[in-house]
């Protein structure tokens, strides 16, 4: 009897050790109750994921007869990004426990809210970012750039949508997809149009000949869920593959939230598929190490600089920041044939994305090598960049 007890205890302990971990968030205010991101182990195939999802769906069907469970949706969406597999859903505690015990699951994380990183300040003010990134020395508004101007590069603006009819896009913008239920295929906020035009606009942008694809993943108030951002990333990779644009694509994420490992992995795998990913450092005036997407691997994270080549007061900083780029008082296009001025690392990121697109077009550099090349080209100009942070300011290599 004693031997049986010892063996049974050992098996139970082994099961507990093998169970997947539910990653805890240091900040609970942005967590979506009962909603989870489930990341599968590397050995899990696409077919394995489909079978696993069927199993989870059956579990949920059994659970919805229990009190308090009927309002949970169960499985929502599966993610297949460059060989990386995950899914999202809302589950009761018993179903979650079964998922954690499944040997195909790597870890589980709460779905969380994420927000834009731009602040509207005023309308119709002159811009300065274009001139700054095309000159080593400060003080000029002339924008000097390679004539290829991002030609042949596809820019994915994952944001609040894009006003694709705005004249600043010159007919180069198309609607891609909308993953936010209950919203229209438009940009009622303005943030998405502003960031896309900063990167690609004919007047306000850097890569003036790039193709533009609108991907709506944030609602009309500038907020969203990481589960939807991941869905948008999956769509972008699939769309780029269909268009033979992998290796010739840029994706911008001007958003920020608490660190979410599942989201970081999705972003990294999108980058690894052959897309240059520019991201915002965040607007909390703190170290961006614990922020997503800033902390994701293989992305080019931008902090915001001022017209005086100083760190913008709200900009995050830290070792994950690869470059500073103009981010304070940036004029760009906004919906309904308008313009506006916004401030934040949301504006810095598309500067990096736009220069990255021009570099890919003119020098035929692979997306995976773009950020390192931008760092190599950059000007050491930013004063008081923050602790453990580069002082490198984005430069497009114009020779000026």
Swiss-Prot record:
Residues 20-117 form a propeptide. The keyword Hydrolase applies. Glycans are attached at residues 138, 252, 336-337, 388, 396. The keyword Secreted applies. Secreted subtilisin-like serine protease with keratinolytic activity that contributes to pathogenicity. The active site is at residues 159, 191, 346. Belongs to the peptidase S8 family. One of its GO terms (biological process) is proteolysis. Keywords: Glycoprotein, Hydrolase, Protease, Secreted, Serine protease, Signal, Virulence, Zymogen. It is found in: Secreted. GO terms for cellular component: extracellular region. It is an enzyme of class 3 (hydrolase). One of its GO terms (molecular function) is serine-type endopeptidase activity. Its EC number is 3.4.21.-. Residues 1-19 form the signal peptide. Residues 127-400 form the Peptidase S8 domain. Its main location: secreted. Gene3D superfamilies: Peptidase S8 propeptide/proteinase inhibitor I9 (3.30.70.80), Peptidase S8/S53 domain (3.40.50.200). Residues 35-116 form the Inhibitor I9 domain. InterPro entries: PCSK9_ProteinaseK-like, Peptidase_S8/S53_dom, Peptidase_S8/S53_dom_sf, Peptidase_S8_subtilisin-like, Peptidase_S8_subtilisin-rel, S8pro/Inhibitor_I9, S8pro/Inhibitor_I9_sf. It comes from the Eukaryota. This is Subtilisin-like protease 11. It holds the Pfam family Inhibitor_I9.
């Amino acid at each position: 009897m004693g031997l049986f007890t010892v063996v049974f205890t050992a098996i139970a302990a082994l099961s507990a050790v093998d169970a997947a971990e539910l990653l805890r968030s240091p900040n609970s205010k942005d967590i979506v109750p009962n909603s989870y991101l489930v990341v599968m182990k590397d050995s899990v195939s696409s077919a394995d994921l489909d079978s696993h999802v069927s199993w989870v769906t059956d579990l949920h069907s059994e659970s919805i007869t229990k009190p308090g469970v009927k309002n949970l949706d169960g499985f929502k969406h599966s993610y297949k990004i460059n060989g990386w597999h995950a899914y999202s859903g809302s589950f009761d505690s018993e179903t979650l426990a079964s998922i954690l015990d499944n040997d195909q699951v790597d870890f589980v994380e709460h779905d969380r809210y994420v927000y834009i990183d731009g602040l509207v300040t005023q309308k119709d003010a002159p811009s300065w970012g274009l001139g700054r990134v095309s000159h080593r020395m400060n003080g000029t508004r002339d924008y000097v750039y390679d004539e290829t101007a991002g030609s042949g590069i596809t820019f994915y603006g994952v944001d609040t949508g894009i006003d694709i009819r705005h004249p600043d896009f010159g007919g180069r913008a198309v609607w891609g997809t909308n993953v936010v239920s209950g919203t229209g295929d438009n940009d009622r906020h303005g943030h998405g149009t502003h960031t896309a035009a900063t990167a690609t606009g004919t007047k306000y942008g850097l890569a003036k000949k790039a193709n533009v694809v609108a991907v709506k993943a944030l609602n009309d108030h500038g907020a969203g869920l990481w589960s939807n951002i991941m869905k948008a990333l999956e769509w972008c990779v699939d769309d780029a593959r269909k268009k033979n644009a992998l290796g010739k694509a840029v994706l911008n994420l001007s958003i920020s939230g608490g660190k979410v490992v599942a989201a970081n992995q999705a972003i990294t795998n999108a980058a690894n598929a052959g897309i240059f990913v520019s991201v915002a450092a965040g607007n909390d005036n703190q170290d961006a190490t614990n922020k997503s997407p800033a902390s994701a691997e293989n992305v080019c994270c931008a902090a915001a600089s001022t017209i005086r080549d100083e760190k913008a007061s709200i900009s995050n900083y830290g070792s994950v920041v690869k470059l500073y780029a103009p981010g304070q008082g940036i004029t760009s296009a906004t919906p309904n044939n308008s313009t506006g001025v916004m401030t934040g690392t949301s504006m810095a990121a598309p500067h990096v994305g736009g220069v990255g697109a021009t570099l890919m077009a003119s020098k035929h550099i692979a997306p995976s090598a773009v950020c390192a090349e931008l760092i190599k080209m950059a000007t050491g100009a930013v004063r008081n960049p923050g602790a453990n942070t580069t002082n490198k300011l984005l430069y497009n290599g114009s020779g000026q």
